[in-house]
């Protein structure tokens, strides 16, 4: 009888080990993580051009050590095969193998990055698959600021570009930036905001690893969706963020803002001091952080300036895009030049410090633009752009339809 019981116990132990082996030995995620971070990289263009997404994911894996995530979880959703499918994966530290590993949590065989419902469900799935007390989101792809979607990228493209329009035509032989590509799979920023706001949970922050996304029109539309937004007012080189450096900061226990502040510095440090290690081999990187709770107050200050404007030389205004149509101009510099009331300018600058902390504003001496293959000097930097001063009649009309413009005029 005792021998029989012993055999049964041994059999149960063997079955238990067999079950564990089917469930990935070394993969033991917490039932409720302290934080889940989702890196969402829609589109194929950056992968086809230079395996930039694969390099980013590899970089995340290098950051995931036995201590970096703590009680957190790191998810990656991307499209390795084609533009109509996607995978939700988790990069975790396998204590048995003593290295990071990747496991696929969910596959999407019918995915469209331009479908708001699909993107909304993807965000919901991240929380279902990796429930946590707090959440962070990184979107890495192509970006074109506030320009309404119609055949470009997530989150913005161009509505009806004329064939001879220079605005989104990159120069022959230009280096890869995260600006143009994957036409036909895009979201409007208002659609992205809605997909975020409808969730039963809230992302603390959104990091845009995309070009031109630190523009006030976009940030204002997202002010109710997340608490903090990290982005660049100009083009981001194809390499994007140094994920091996920023991921550990995103899981630190010193507060969300502290981790994001360090992430901003790491981005700048890569392109200021270690740019020779990048594929782009370009010393070009500008970054900032927006405190979305301060943007309504900033809009109020801006509204008080509309009746105090004066003529100014637009050629003296700091811009963030190459070629003829600059489109993106430094917001604070614009107010400084166009407002005739020094007190109003000072009030605006004071609110800018609340909305865009100086500790998170970093820039190289110049930025590279794929639209003319040139480097352009940064002589004034507040970290955020505005398109209101653009002299092009076409973009003036479109910009006046943005929520930022309507709420400040």
Model region roles, listed by residue range:
Residues 1-9, 232:
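Bacterial N-terminal signal peptides that target proteins for export
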Residues 11-13, 235:
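Long, well-ordered alpha/beta core segments of mature domains
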Residues 16-19:
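C-terminal motif of bacterial Sec signal peptides marking the signal peptidase cleavage site
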Residues 21-132, 397-405:
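N-terminal extension/subdomain marker
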Residues 30, 163-409:
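Terminal, contiguous helix-loop blocks that mediate binding/assembly
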Residues 36-41, 73-77, 136-139, 204-208, ...:
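Structural recognition of the beta-strand scaffold that forms the well-ordered cores
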Residues 46-51, 84-86, 145-149, 213-218, ...:
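Extracytoplasmic/secreted cell-surface and envelope-processing proteins
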Residues 79-82, 90-99, 111-198, 210-211, ...:
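Catalytic-core segments of thiol-dependent peptidases
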